[in-house]
Amino acid sequence: VTMANIAQLINNLQSLFLAHEDRFIVTPNFHVFEMYMPHYNGQSVRTVFTAPEVNFTKTDNNPDQLSGLAGSASLHGKQLILTAVNPSITEARETEIMARGAKIKAAAATVLSEKDVHARNSFENPDAVQVKKAEVRIAGDNALFTFPPASVVQLTLELG
């Protein structure tokens, strides 16, 4: 990613911030932008995701599908940044993550997800939706991680 742009920065639909008089809060969209920032100046890495598709009905009552997981990866020396989205609002995605030609030595996860997919930050509850750390297991040369339903996840993988 060379540049990301958002037109409505403050007090609009999908904005990063909300402000009113002397109050200022960040939205979940801010956290997503922050989670994708580590890709900056990285070497793009091809990713392949295999997960069951998410079936849904559009507002015009026509059926449609989304990939069960989607994301991107970038390499910074021996550190691989993987960001992914699980669009299913009901199903977690148990995964095995492989780095072709490398061994995953250590891993950390940052997760943005809430049980209520309608949760939002407000002036009354500014920290309702926050990023959280999650466990990533190492199994041999690979990593094991469960993507929660309706989540955006940043994995930092140390390669050896």
Residue ranges and their predicted role:
Residues 1-70:
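Aromatic/acidic polysaccharide-binding cleft in carbohydrate-active enzymes
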Residues 71-73, 136:
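A structural signal for short hydrophobic beta-strand segments in well-ordered beta-sheet cores
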Residues 52-66, 80, 85-160:
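C-terminal beta-sandwich/jelly-roll accessory domains of carbohydrate-active enzymes
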Residues 16, 32, 72, 84, ...:
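Conserved hydrophobic/aromatic beta-strand scaffold that supports enzyme active sites
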Residues 76-78:
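RNase H-like, metal-dependent nuclease domains and their acidic two-metal-ion catalytic environment used
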